[in-house]
Amino acid sequence: MDRSSAVGGCGGGGGLGVGVVTSSATALGPGGLTNGGGGVVSGALNGLEAMSAESTGLCLQDLVSAGTANGAGSAGSAESATTTSTALSSGSTGSSTVNGGGSSTSGTEHLHSHHSLHDSSSSVSISPAISSLMPISSLSHLHHSAGQDLVGGYSQHPHHTVVPPHTPKHEPLEKLRIWAETGDFRDSHSSMTAVANSLDSTHLNNFQTSSTSSISNRSRDRKDGNRSVNETTIKTENISSSGHDEPMTTSGEEPKNDKKNKRQRRQRTHFTSQQLQELEHTFSRNRYPDMSTREEIAMWTNLTEARVRVWFKNRRAKWRKRERNAMNAAVAAADFKSGFGTQFMQPFADDSLYSSYPYNNWTKVPSPLGTKPFPWPVNPLGSMVAGNHHQNSVNCFNTGASGVAVSMNNASMLPGSMGSSLSNTSNVGAVGAPCPYTTPANPYMYRSAAEPCMSSSMSSSIATLRLKAKQHASAGFGSPYSAPSPVSRSNSAGLSACQYTGVGVTDVV
């Protein structure tokens, strides 16, 4: 006896009728399902009760797939699996066709016809009877092992195990629940693919598809809503900020334009000579004229009051600068006088350097004649050291009158202090002082100031000295630019040899 299961969707009531009928005939009506030909309905109802009692999940595929057939046919025992196409509709009366007679010897053949359920996003309507028998949680967690309860035979899917609906061991569903709670769905298709790969079976029921799709849609809507809210807030903030910024920029540009207009360089005012003369005259009298005075000056000079005010301001600045420079110059001059001028204006610290200089003590200085080389072997002082010893104590000057005259001539040509000292020494020499012009015989031997000038030691006469002087002058060693000696200006006929020697020394030097 062949048995097949048929599922019919009732259009009017929207319920789902389940029954086991024979292969002879099947009649589906709005009220449910009627069987003919001695079909058995109690098996299906008992299977539903047992399934609800065990609280196991019901898979929609088991309702559609065929059970085991144990009947004696003409050809022997055969198992015919008939499938019905599930029609889900809301308005039209649903009908289900039973395909019988399809026998197969392969045993348990599982034909799937519910793949269209995965593409649909609408939920399946369930009759109140099934919904009362089964909890909602069990409907969302269905397994293919329910066929054993319906038919009483062996399980068509031995690789599936009956798992309680909510067990923490089912990791893929736990991950799905976590993803659903967090709403982390970047792509619904990729998430569905990951879940399908993680599950043991690639066939998901309609309830799972609808729930995941609804959750993903809900999360997507939530994200879209948040995104739209953020965009609107950002847009409004940008608009508000830009609205605030625009008047700021316009208000900032306006003062800039005003400043540019104010800072435009005006043309310099060129004053005439008459205007400058009038302004200078007024400035000499009053450096700070008031408003009325400036207006009068402006009328006289044919200028504006502003130009007159600016001119006085600049003129006062120029006047202050000049006054400041003058004060600085005066202070600098005072500092110079106090710091350096007093040193130059003070008398010499040691007047005895020049006033009390011993001009009569010339014997301490070496003679320049002894150090100068001459091309001829002349030793004018060698004759003085010769062996002529005259004991005539003769002074350098013949008479006192001539000595006084010479001293007066020297004093007239020299400065006051030096002339006075020279005249004093000459007077002393006229009285009986030794001759100050005596040159030592040896340049490294000095005569003492107390030693008298002995003319007896000289071996040559005045004529011999004059002859040597002429020879020296004719040789070209005399300097034409040398100043004449004051002694030579005086009466040279009455000069002694000592004085003549001094004249020669002056010419050579």
UniProtKB/Swiss-Prot annotation:
Gene3D superfamilies for the chain: Homeodomain-like
Annotated region of DNA binding: 262-322
Motif (Nuclear localization signal): 464-470
Subcellular location(s) per record: Nucleus
Entry-linked PROSITE patterns: HOMEOBOX_1, HOMEOBOX_2, OAR
UniProt KW keywords: Activator, Developmental protein, DNA-binding, Homeobox, Nucleus, Transcription, Transcription regulation
Family stated for the protein in its record: Belongs to the paired homeobox family. Bicoid subfamily.
Protein name, per record: Pituitary homeobox homolog Ptx1
Organism: Drosophila melanogaster (Fruit fly)
